[in-house]
A protein has these predicted regions:
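Intrinsically disordered, low-complexity terminal regions
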Residues: 1-298
């Protein structure tokens, strides 16, 4: 056998040993609780991925794997339905964090409070309340919870639904929304993408990231968008034109939505654009220090 062949066999053997060691080092998690339909679940999880799934049963079921040596505190199931649960998983190393994953099934009407470090979090079919806090991972929500508070420092936040009340915050992560009744979203350098839905009230803020808005306006809607240097791009239907108040300090305004031409601001700096609309067609306020504001039709 050649020297290259010997090295190849050695590499394969090492990979098999590493894989077997990793599997052996993992610990399975499985526990279930009888709970009330509106149970409050608090989970601190130091694992790679967390899935929260709403279902019709009045029970909470936690399954998954964690690395050996992890601290796991999942409590003891009681004799009757409980109104509150506190769950805790702490992995010993960063590598151990990546190896762990949890799936938590909760009643649809549950309120879930979740805090993780670098986990990627996915939530689906929960109609109660969600409070999600992640440092380095992403957050994805499918469905329309009653309340949603989601914060990720570096990861993206995607909301595929229309929560009644929503607040989303990132530092560098992008934000993607599909509408809702009362929306608040802010980022420092990430982008905010809001499209393919309807909104009643919204306040979107970014420092350097772009804002792209293409939501339909509910009757009497109120929308505010503000950036420092990030561009603002707004797409609107021409069928029910809202009142629009747009202004920049040094940035440009381009109106491709109507024939009204923006005018120079005070002292020749920046631009302003004021458009009248119907009393019930909504109002949009756009502000940027030096970012460009663009209006266009849908």
């Amino acid at each position: 056998m050649t020297v290259a062949g010997v090295h190849r066999i050695g590499l394969i053997f090492a990979m098999l040993v590493a894989s077997a060691t990793s599997l052996h080092a993992q610990r399975k998690v499985h526990t279930a609780y009888s709970v009330t339909p509106d149970v409050s679940v608090r989970l601190i999880a130091s694992v790679g991925t967390v899935q929260v799934v709403g279902w019709e049963k009045d029970s909470v079921v936690v399954t998954g794997v964690v690395a050996a040596g992890s601290q796991v505190s999942l409590g003891t199931p009681g004799a009757g339905p409980t109104r509150g649960l506190k769950l805790f998983v702490e992995s010993p190393t960063e590598q151990a964090v990546r190896e762990g994953s949890l799936t938590v099934r909760v009643p649809r009407g549950a309120r879930v409070w979740l805090k993780t470090g670098s986990s990627d979090v996915t939530v689906s079919e929960v109609t109660g309340g969600l409070d999600l806090n992640v440092v380095g991972g992403s957050i994805t929500v499918h469905g329309s919870p009653r309340e949603l508070n989601a914060e990720s420092m570096d990861g993206a936040v995607t909301v595929d639904g229309s929560p009644s009340w929503m607040r989303v915050k990132t530092a560098t992560g992008d934000i993607a929304l599909r509408g809702g009744e009362d929306i608040g979203a802010s980022t420092i350098s990430g982008t905010i993408e809001a499209r393919a839905g309807e909104v009643e009230r919204a306040k979107l803020e970014s420092t350097t990231g772009a804002i792209h808005f293409a939501l339909a306006l509910a009757r009497g809607a109120s929308v505010e968008m503000e950036t420092h240097s990030g561009p603002i791009d707004v797409q609107l239907s021409r069928k029910s034109p809202p009142e629009i108040d747009a202004a920049t300090v040094t940035g440009a305004i381009e109106n491709l939505w109507s024939k009204i031409v923006p005018v120079a601001g005070r002292e020749g700096r920046g631009m302003t654009l004021a458009l009248g609309g119907g009393p019930l067609d909504g109002r949009i306020e756009l502000r940027s220090f030096k970012g460009k504001i663009t209006l266009r039709g849908m």
